[in-house]
Regions:
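Short, hydrophobic-rich beta-strand element in sensory/regulatory alpha-beta domains
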Residues: 3-6, 12-20, 26, 52
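Acidic/proline- and glycine-rich, intrinsically disordered low-complexity segments
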Residues: 36-69, 119-122
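Short beta-strand-to-loop transition segments that serve as allosteric relay/switch motifs
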Residues: 31-34, 101-111
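Amphipathic alpha-helical regulatory segments at dimerization interfaces
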Residues: 1-8, 50-53, 57, 77-78, ...
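Regulatory loop-to-helix N-cap segments in sensory/regulatory domains
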Residues: 106-124, 130-139
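GAF sensory/regulatory domain recognition
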Residues: 16-47
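Helix-to-coil/beta transition segments that act as allosteric "coupling" elements at the rims
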Residues: 74-100
Length: 139
């Protein structure tokens, strides 16, 4: 699963949310290292400028003390409650430019090394390739 891949990449907490275009929301699909209620999380993109931006096209955002003040108020309260701390990665994954899921991950709030961020990015690319291959097979 995507969560297992992220755990193998060193992320101690992760949340994978799928885009539900009919309901215009993100729905939690997989979670690791988070409270049980994380599995029931739904996010409304219109409530967060950061989430809206990430859903426009596949992209990555690294939150750390230097930019946390800028972005914290723009994050959904549900995510802030689950991922307390100043070190967080958010990445939207997609196929052919269309975003299908949002991944949120960290190392229990600890600072992320550049190597950890690169590993997260590479793992995310692998998940995207798998999504693309799965989609071509017709589901």
């Amino acid at each position: 699963t995507a969560s297992q891949a992220l755990t193998s990449a060193g992320m101690q907490r992760s949340l994978v949310l799928l885009v539900d275009r009919k309901q215009n929301r993100l729905v939690a699909q997989q979670c690791v290292g988070l409270p049980g209620d994380a599995a029931r999380l739904t996010l409304a993109p219109e409530q967060s400028q950061v989430v809206r931006r990430l859903l426009e096209k596949p992209a990555q955002l690294r939150l750390q003390p230097a930019n946390m003040a800028q972005f914290s108020a723009l994050l959904p309260s549900g995510l802030k409650a689950l991922f307390a701390g100043e070190h967080l990665l958010l990445r939207s994954l997609g196929v052919d430019g269309r975003v299908l899921m949002l991944v949120v991950a960290d190392q229990n709030g600890a600072p992320l090394s550049d190597a950890s961020v690169q590993t997260f990015a590479k793992t995310s690319q692998c998940i995207e390739r798998a999504l693309s291959l799965f989609g071509r097979r017709g589901g």
